[in-house]
Every structure is written in C-alpha cells, then in structure tokens.
C-alpha cells in the first residue's frame, strides 16, 4: 500500500515541480523584458535636459519598473524555495519506493 501512495505522491510532486519551474521561467522572462524597458527609458532620458519634466516622468517610470523587478525577484525566490522543498520530498518518496521495491523482491 505504501508503494502505491508514494508513487501517486511522486506524480503529484512532479506536477508541482513542473508548475513551479514554469512560473520561475515566466518571471525570468518578465524580468528580462523589464530590464530592457528600463534601459530604453534611460536612453530616451539621455536625449533631454535633466530639468525637463519629461525626464522626471521617465525617472518615475523607471523607479516603478525597478520596484516591480524587486517584487518579481522576491516572488521568484519564494518559488525557488518551494521548488527545493518539493524536490527534497520527491527524493524522499523516491527512496521509499526504491526501498519498498527492493524489499518486495528480496528472497529471505
């Protein structure tokens, strides 16, 4: 019975792992796009005088983008931590399955 439960648990954990990896990938992609946007704002801002109101608006937008990037980084760290936990539990289930299989097929 433990073998079946552990096998089902492993399938569930594998699905959770794939979901977390996908979310991490999306966040990484979004952060890359944010950095590109920040760099574009910096390049546009360099064309204007520093006292120009447009530059102030661009700096505010850049600050908002950096704040969003920090939030995404925190979210990604949370997902990475959850992923490590899932992988640890998956390995534990895998070890129990291997032990149950070895015990089932050993002749004593």
Where are these regions (language model features)?
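Amphipathic alpha-helical polymerization modules
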Residues: 1-108
């Amino acid at each position: 019975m433990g073998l079946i439960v552990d096998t089902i648990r492993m399938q569930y954990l594998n699905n959770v792992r794939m979901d977390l990896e996908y979310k991490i990938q999306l966040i990484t992609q979004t952060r890359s796009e944010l950095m590109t946007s920040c760099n574009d704002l910096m390049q546009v801002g360099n064309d204007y005088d520093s006292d120009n109101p447009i530059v102030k608006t661009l700096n505010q937008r850049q600050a908002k983008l950096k704040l969003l990037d920090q939030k995404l980084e925190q979210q990604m760290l949370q997902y990475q931590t959850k992923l490590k936990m899932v992988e640890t539990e998956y390995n534990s289930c895998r070890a129990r399955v291997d032990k149950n299989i070895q015990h089932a097929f050993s002749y004593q």
